């Protein structure tokens, strides 16, 4: 029998799962159809398509992990099951982080202006090497997830502790302790791509400041297209920073949940908050991307007309 908190958790996480799949699936479908029609795809759409596929995987793994942990806490007594879940989560998490970083760096290189030779070389090269960069993201994520699987496979201490516990609730709390160090370590590794995104963000803000300063010399009373593009990209990157910070804090909360009296409630809250990252940022991308937003508005308009008819 589920408690009221469990019922609320299931309802919320199911709603997030549906919205996440629909939102990310919409981006992938629009870009795929556009690719088929034009026989080619832009670099930003190519990165976005790979990103939303990674996010669909991440959302799916997080939902499965949340439901399994909360509704079947004795999963921690079965080493292989927990290792499989954590390995897939690590892979999807890192793949999502690195591709998002690629998107942020791409925005910076394409929108910002600079006369630095390295910047100009990267700006020229990015379109030609994006396939290899994304392949590198896949390879890094796969390598880290395999290392995570090996580390957890070598750590059987939690099984030795859990098998002496008769109460499943106690088992849930105690068996997470050995995962503290690996979880914390792999969470900290995710800071690396985030720092790269943060650097790109500040450099883009600096570029906007310099551009705005130049525009003031030729004040026209309205923003020029370049300024609008700068602002839109900064909004996208700001939303990423916000949602990733929420995701990171939620991951830390779940990692330390075994120290809390209401650990089960902490895990439920952490899972719900963490899923907002791959869900919320993708919805922001739809709103700020002209093509995605216009197609969505046309779909809603056609639906309203069909309902009236």
Curated annotation (Swiss-Prot):
Pfam families: TAS2R. Its main location: membrane. CDD domains: 7tm_TAS2R8 (cd15022). Glycans are attached at residue 167. GO terms for molecular function: bitter taste receptor activity; G protein-coupled receptor activity. Residues 1-7, 72-82, 153-184, 261-266 are extracellular. The keyword Membrane applies. It is a multi-pass membrane protein. Coiled coil: none annotated. It comes from the Eukaryota. Receptor that may play a role in the perception of bitterness and is gustducin-linked. May play a role in sensing the chemical composition of the gastrointestinal content. The activity of this receptor may stimulate alpha gustducin, mediate PLC-beta-2 activation and lead to the gating of TRPM5. This is Taste receptor type 2 member 8. The gene is TAS2R8.
């Amino acid at each position: 029998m589920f408690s009221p908190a469990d019922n609320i958790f299931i309802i919320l996480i199911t709603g997030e799962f549906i919205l996440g799949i629909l939102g990310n699936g919409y981006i992938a479908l629009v870009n795929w159809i556009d690719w088929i029609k034009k026989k080619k795809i832009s670099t930003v759409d190519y990165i976005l398509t790979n990103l939303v596929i990674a996010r669909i995987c991440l959302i799916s793994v997080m939902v499965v992990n949340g439901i399994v942990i909360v509704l079947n806490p004795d999963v921690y007594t079965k080493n292989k099951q927990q290792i499989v879940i954590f390995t897939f989560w690590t892979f999807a998490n890192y793949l999502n982080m690195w591709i998002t970083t690629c998107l942020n760096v791409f925005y910076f290189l394409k929108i910002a202006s600079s006369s630095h030779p390295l910047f100009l070389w990267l700006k020229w090269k990015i379109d030609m090497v994006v396939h290899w960069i994304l392949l590198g993201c896949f390879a890094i994520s796969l390598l880290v997830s395999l290392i995570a699987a090996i580390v957890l496979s070598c750590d059987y201490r939690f099984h030795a502790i859990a098998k002496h516990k008769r109460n499943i609730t106690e088992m849930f709390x105690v068996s997470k302790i050995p995962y503290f160090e690996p979880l914390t370590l792999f969470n900290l590794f995710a800071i690396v791509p985030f720092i790269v995104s943060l650097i790109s963000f500040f450099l883009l803000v600096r570029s906007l400041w310099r551009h705005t300063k130049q525009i003031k010399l030729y004040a026209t009373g309205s923003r020029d297209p370049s300024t609008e593009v700068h602002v839109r990209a900064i909004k996208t990157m700001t939303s990423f920073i916000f949602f990733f910070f929420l995701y990171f804090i939620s991951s830390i909360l779940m990692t330390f949940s075994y120290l809390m009296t209401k650990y089960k409630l902490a895990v439920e809250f952490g899972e719900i908050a963490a899923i907002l990252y791959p869900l919320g940022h993708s919805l922001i991308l739809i709103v700020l991307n002209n093509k995605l937003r216009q197609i969505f508005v046309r779909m809603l308009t056609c639906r309203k007309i069909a309902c009236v008819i």
